[in-house]
Regions:
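Membrane-embedded, hydrophobic transmembrane alpha-helices
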Residues: 1-84
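Membrane-interface alpha helices of multi-pass inner-membrane proteins
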Residues: 41-47, 252-267, 271-278
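Perimembrane helix-loop-helix junctions
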Residues: 67, 71-83, 272-308, 590-594
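Active-site lumenal/periplasmic loops and adjacent helix-entry segments of GT-C-fold
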Residues: 98-199, 220
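Membrane-lumen/periplasm interface segments of specific transmembrane helices
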Residues: 106-110, 153-156, 285-286, 297-408
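Hydrophobic/aromatic-rich transmembrane helices and adjacent perimembrane loops
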Residues: 124, 173, 225-235, 265, ...
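Membrane-embedded, lumen/periplasm-facing catalytic core of multi-pass transferases
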Residues: 511-577, 697-698
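Short periplasmic/luminal acceptor-recognition loop of GT-C membrane glycosyltransferases, typified by
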Residues: 526-527, 552-610, 651-654
Length: 698
């Protein structure tokens, strides 16, 4: 049944793409990316207006109506199928159906820390409530303000049936495949010798730029809800789609929803959307379709402005207006308000530092941290310490991308196309420097000191650009490998003579794509074991998560819908608590700690979210328990449990420190928990009383 629910979403997407292709002239290989982007844009606006559920129904009904319209109007037409099924669209629909069935059979689960703390949890909350996760009541003290693009994309594929982790991966992988289709969007059927190896290259991209060691654990590529890879793919896919649209003389507006989606994935990759918009706008504005710069300058200028308006509208509506409201609401509800410096002030003061101008206050204190971050990032780029891809450090990645651009320029059969590719390559290189500056500013003035010292998650942040940059370079190469027709006009008295020349790229450049595909597949085969990848993972990879979820389902069966759970997981580093928040929902798991704000400095201090609970004098000298030790007296813990409105304590893990510290708070001195008789204690006036339950099913 759940498989049919997802296939219904795929069928609705197909109907929408058919309308775009047969009625709106959008190429079949570009239509999936445009359709998915438009769906996310509609759902985002509807969710912000509080009408997500009816809007989703309306989208499905419109897709169905569009499919009926297309089927009725194209009955008996012999050209419809040929327009719908091109090399790019066949690649997309084949992979979409294959992965839908494959993931339904294999049932992968969310396991990574950030999936449980944000990405997968956001999707589950959106599905359960049929509303934005950012407005949901949670046990966490902070407002969830991450962009809703990906969770709402997953919501579209989760709409029918029950929530399931694997449906997230289906939705996100379908987005991946829509980008792949866009890259080969302009390749005709007779160019299969280009399309096939290009598809192999595209398959390798998510692996190639995110893995750099031999696998000894499961690599979650194609099985993750993180936003870093999608951000890079959509950034590059927008430019690749644009190149294919121009090559096919298709409607240019089809790229605008893609640019909007690029701005709706992650807040810190909004700059990638601006880069994509800039590359598209410059290509449109500088290179007129007929070669006459002055002709049609005003419409080209208007479209260039629209390219920037699409992502900036999303940024303003969500990141400025909506997030501003969420943060102020969280602060007024005794939660956490604004927790980082304003972006505009960060940019201004960072540039002042680079120009040698003095800065004051917070920025003067962080100047050394900013400069150190820049130095460390340079070290990661230039030296072998920076293992960021399957071919090593950043300089190697940039060299590979430069080679692809160079081959594309050489392969292009017309001077105009050579110039367009050269401009895109040069500008994307300049933007790469700007993106690195943005990362340095983030480490210097937004992230915490220890994060800057360790360049925490630097590889995830930088490979978003590398992936997008490589994808748009492949898009340039795909267009360059197509035949180019140049038209020359010569005056002959009162008449004009037009001469058209069809130029074919040399076979050697097509061979380059094959060599690139073989090289990337070979390198991937060296580092990624099939049994530790999406293509061959063992069911045992998710044994622990299945056990955790089974325990959560057992515990929830003994709870009331309005219960609020205090989490006790001794020795936890926070991951167990996030897992409980995810698995228990819609039953709320409390932050299980305190949130205090210094009235003088405004600094917020949060103690909770898992960790070791115990008396101050019992804190271990070292180890995980020392690092995540939350020291409370017995009276303080009792006040926290009751003050936070908790009705039940969930004893996930017990140890001697907790028993020695807080046994007197429990009516049975924790005897039932120690004997394995229960995992739950009800908060009563007399103390925390054990709840009878069958724990043998764990």
């Amino acid at each position: 049944m759940e498989l049919l629910c997802v296939l219904a979403a795929v069928a609705a997407l197909f109907c929408g793409c058919a309308v775009l292709t047969l009625k709106c002239r959008v190429p079949a290989s570009i239509a999936p990316l445009t359709a998915l982007s438009a769906i996310v844009a509609v759902l985002t606006l509807a969710a912000m207006a509080g009408v997500l559920y009816p809007a989703a129904w309306l989208l499905y009904l419109l897709c169905l109506a569009g499919g009926v319209w297309v089927a009725a109007s194209c009955r008996g037409s012999t050209g419809a199928a040929q327009r719908l099924f091109t090399p790019g669209s066949v690649l997309f629909w084949g992979m979409a159906l294959a992965f839908t069935i494959y993931f339904f059979v294999r049932q992968p689960m969310a396991t990574d820390f950030d999936e449980l703390s944000l990405w997968a949890t956001a999707v589950k909350i959106t599905k359960v409530n049929d509303s934005l996760y950012a407005t949901a009541e949670l046990g966490t003290p902070w407002a969830a303000t991450q962009n809703p693009g990906l969770p709402l994309l997953a919501y579209f594929f989760q709409f029918f049936g029950d929530y399931a982790d694997w449906k997230i991966y289906v939705g996100y992988d379908i987005l991946y495949f829509s980008v792949f289709a866009a890259v080969v969007g302009a390749v005709p059927r007779e160019k299969w010798r280009v399309a096939v190896p290009m598809a192999a290259v595209l398959w390798c991209v998510p692996f190639f730029f995110t893995n750099y060691n031999h696998t000894i654990y499961l690599t979650t590529t194609y099985m993750t809800s993180y936003g870093d890879v999608p951000a890079g793919l959509v950034f590059g896919g927008a430019v690749a789609a644009w190149l294919a649209l121009r090559q096919s003389s298709a409607p240019k507006w089809a790229v605008l929803p893609i640019l909007a989606l690029s701005a709706n994935i992650k807040a810190n990759t909004f700059v990638l959307a601006l880069v994509a918009a800039g590359l598209v706008a410059v290509d449109e504005w500088l290179f007129a379709d007929d070669g006459d710069f002055k002709a049609g300058l005003l419409p080209r200028t208007g479209f260039s402005v629209a390219c920037f308006a699409a992502p900036m509208a999303i940024y303003y509506l969500w990141n400025v207006r909506y997030v501003g409201w969420l943060v102020s609401r969280s602060a007024s509800d005794s939660g956490v308000g604004e927790t980082s410096a304003p972006l505009s002030a960060v940019v201004v003061n960072g540039i002042k530092i680079l120009l040698g101008q003095p800065v004051e206050g917070f920025y003067a204190e962080r100047e050394a941290q900013f400069r150190t971050a820049m130095t460390d990032m340079g070290h990661q780029f230039w030296t072998s310490d920076g293992k960021l891809s399957m071919i090593g450090q950043g300089r190697n990645v940039v060299a590979l991308i430069a080679i692809v651009f160079a081959v594309a320029i050489l392969a292009a059969a017309s001077r105009r196309l050579k110039a367009r590719i050269a401009v895109i390559g040069a500008l994307s290189g300049v933007c790469f420097l700007g993106y690195n500056l943005m990362l340095a500013l983030s480490y210097g003035f937004i992230f915490k000191t220890f994060q800057a010292e360790q360049l925490t998650d630097y590889n995830r942040y930088i490979y978003s650009y590398y992936i997008g940059w490589f994808i748009l370079a492949l898009g340039c190469l795909s267009v360059a490998l197509l035949p180019q027709i140049t038209v020359k006009c010569e005056a002959d008295g009162p008449t004009a003579v037009f001469a058209a020349t069809r130029r074919q790229p040399r076979l050697a450049f097509e061979l380059f794509v094959l060599v690139l595909a073989c090289g990337m597949l070979f390198r991937q085969g060296q580092l990624i074991l099939p049994q530790l990848s999406v293509l061959g993972f063992a069911d045992s990879e998710f044994t622990d998560r299945r056990a955790e979820r089974a325990e959560a389902e057992l515990v929830c069966s003994y709870l009331d819908p309005d219960d609020r759970v205090f989490y006790v997981g001794q020795g936890d580093n926070g991951e167990g608590w996030f897992s409980a928040v995810f698995d228990f929902y819609p039953i709320l798991v409390d932050y299980s700690g305190t949130v205090t704000t210094d009235p003088d400095t405004g600094e917020t201090k949060m103690i909770g979210g898992g960790g070791e609970l115990g008396l101050p004098e019992l804190q271990p000298a070292e180890g995980v328990k020392n690092t995540y030790y939350h020291a409370f007296t017995a009276q303080e813990l009792d006040d926290i449990v009751r003050g936070n409105g908790c009705t039940v304590l969930y004893i996930q893990t017990l140890d001697d420190i907790f028993v020695q510290s807080y046994a007197d708070l429990f009516t049975d001195k924790l005897a039932a928990a120690q004997s394995g008789g229960t995992l739950l204690y009800r908060v009563t006036d007399a103390g925390f009383a054990p709840m009878p339950m069958e724990v043998s099913a764990q």
